[in-house]
Amino acid sequence: MKEPILVMMAAGMGSRYGGLKQLDPVGPDGEVILDYSLYDAYQAGFRRVVFLIKHEIEDAFKAMVGSRVPAGMEANYAFQQLDKLPEGFSVPEGRVKPWGTGHAVLCCREFLDAPFLVINADDYYGAGAFKLAYEYLRTLRGKRGEYFMVGYALKNTLTENGYVSRGVCTVNEFGFLKEVRERTHIIASCDGPLFTEDGEMYRRLPDDTTVSMNCWGFTPDFLDALAEGFVPFLNEAMENNPMKAEYYLPTAVSRQLDRHRATARVLTCPDRWYGVTYHEDRAVVAKAMLCKAEES
């Protein structure tokens, strides 16, 4: 049987932080976040990785990261291209924004012939997340319509440096995902996490609220569902928001769940999540990575 695959989404540029986050060193010896994720993934059992990047960063990315892929780990590169669209569609004049995370995974399709995990390359999920994911992926061989999400406690994902957007999850009594609701303005406070919808009135969220940090696992048939949903998305996007509409991975998952075509197990990770949303977050991540290096 083919081994589980790790997909690392490295095509994005941080809109608020600025710059190519994936290649910004945070470790004591110049390591980037992606290096730590690769190490943890390898230790968990992953032996295949697909990097999703843009053609524009290919040389810089391969020079910095390609040579640091663990020995014994097969690496492939896929490219998120704006004009990689279904027959009958073309890129609207003036559009430069990528089509979103759902489209990004579709761009990796040629390499995804086994259950796979999708993560952001500029986020650090913790060793526990990769162990949970790898073991669960191994149970999905030959199955269809069985997805999962690695969830985190909201308190373990916040920054002191500004507001964040988080997918707040509703989980049923059997541990399956019912809904992901995007909260676009959550802040950390002395009273705990607070969110606002209008910028004026803030409401409390429990510390242990399960949130999605875009760490998803899928059986290969999900790619058919992604492709199927991309067409109606494009039809609507071309009419209503041709410059900025994005096809999000959670939207495609919700579509499958709503139609009872799939289930999504929620695997709870106790680790802290680290990411660089704001420039000031880099120091926090660097400190955490130094501690990790000293422990290992």
Regions found by a protein language model. Give the residues of each.
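Short phosphate-binding loop-to-helix
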Residues: 69-115
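A short, conserved beta-strand element in the Rossmann-like catalytic core
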Residues: 14, 124-126
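Conserved nucleotide-sugar donor-binding
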Residues: 215-227
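Conserved core of the sugar-phosphate nucleotidyltransferase
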Residues: 127-213, 220
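A C-terminal functional module that forms or caps the active site or interfaces directly
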Residues: 227-261
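Short beta-strand-to-loop acidic/aromatic patch adjacent to the donor-nucleotide binding site
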Residues: 114-124
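N-terminal glycine-rich phosphate-binding loop and ensuing alpha1 helix
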Residues: 2-66, 75, 80, 114
